Amino acid sequence: MLKYRSLPIKRAIHHPAPGITPISPRIMVSRLRVIPSFNLKFNRWNSSVPESSKKELKTTDGNQESASKVSPVKEKEKVPFKVKMQKALRHYWDGSKLLGLEIKISSKLLMKSAAGYPLTRRENLQLKRTTQDIVRLVPFAAFLIIPFAELLLPFALKLFPNLLPSTYESSKKRENKLENLRNTRKLMSEIIKNNKSHFKPNNISEEQKALFNRFYTHVRATGVPESRQQLIEVARLFTDDTVLDNVTRPYLIALAKYMNLQPFGTDVMLRYRIRYKMLELKKDDLSIYYEDAEQLSLSELKTACASRGIRSVDVEPSVLYSNLRLWLNMRLKDKIPSTLLIMATAYNYGNVQSKESLYDALCDVLIGIPDELYHEVKVNVVKEDEASAKQKLKQLREQEEIMKEEEQQEENAIVSVKDELSLDDQDKNIDAAAPDVKPHDTKPIGEAAAIKEK
């Protein structure tokens, strides 16, 4: 088919010489079989060859590079502001309905508890979560009561993201919080490994002193304990209060961050908050023990493992179930302090997959005391009459320096906290309530299908 793309042909057709009748486009197409390609919209001549034919011609002519060029990636389309507003309003509306439903359910649970009926672990968690959400509404209500204060609400939510109840939290923010917690725990795990912990057992008998001395002599020589039973018996000598009262401030801060606590305040305040968190874990251990871990749903199982410092991301449900049962076994059957278990999970964070690994991590925690503290403990292990007065004087001066430092922190603190909470006394009550029999975690590990998924 003839194409008139050259400039002389175009001028001859549309601007003929004087005395020559111009050819209309219809006659030109029907008789001369010429395709007109003048674009009236853009007032320019266009090629009548399709784009696909152009590419074929280029490739046949040997121009392979231009044909094989990758088209640039299209940018993501911007969501209109109206759509964003509708999505945000729908999210807050759903959160308000969810909060109203939680208040309705929790009010029934509160009436049930006031009537004297016991609440299950799931009901206690629901009541606690709703109470925390209602408390969060108190500062949020100030923005609605004070005139024009709602204009500052976006800035307040940016600075304090936990100002709103948990029902308004989006899935993206929840994932960001979990990711930040995982990164923090990885970092704190390294800090706990590198920082030596300064704690030692107190008020132990002569037989326990001999066991303690034999354990450290064998471990420092071979790197492993004589038996697992020996490791458990030595770990029982370190009570929660003994550990928390003798660790340094960097270790306290790392421990608080690992347990998802804000590390602000003096050492006394940090110890009190860690003790309170440990007490909640002890009670939760007993609740899971009585109700059996098999009754937990998958989301509840992940939450329970995460609160104990056990990795719960990218882990099979059967492995999570095994790790939780191992924790309960070491906590309630072996009666190992929760503080040491938290440190053990921090030592091998993300690698708690067998009983040997967690017991080995517990051994690493006990080995991690410094040499000078080991010599100090060795003085306490032998009879008091054999200890020199110089060694006792050095130990007493160290305790005096710690007390002076804590007193100075309390003087500079705005809020004074009196730490009278004793985990050891609470531990005696919890251990007395737990029967000394094989707990549920001694049963064979179930499959992932046995775990109920909501």
UniProtKB/Swiss-Prot annotation:
Keywords: Coiled coil, Membrane, Mitochondrion, Mitochondrion inner membrane, Transit peptide, Transmembrane, Transmembrane helix
Topological type in the membrane: Single-pass membrane protein
Region (Disordered): 51-73, 420-454
Coiled coil: 376-423
Domain of life: Eukaryota
CC per GO annotation: mitochondrial inner membrane; mitochondrion
Additional comment: Present with 11300 molecules/cell in log phase SD medium.
PANTHER family in the record: LETM1 DOMAIN-CONTAINING PROTEIN YLH47, MITOCHONDRIAL, LEUCINE ZIPPER-EF-HAND CONTAINING TRANSMEMBRANE PROTEIN
Name of protein: LETM1 domain-containing protein YLH47, mitochondrial
Annotated source species: Saccharomyces cerevisiae (strain ATCC 204508 / S288c) (Baker's yeast)
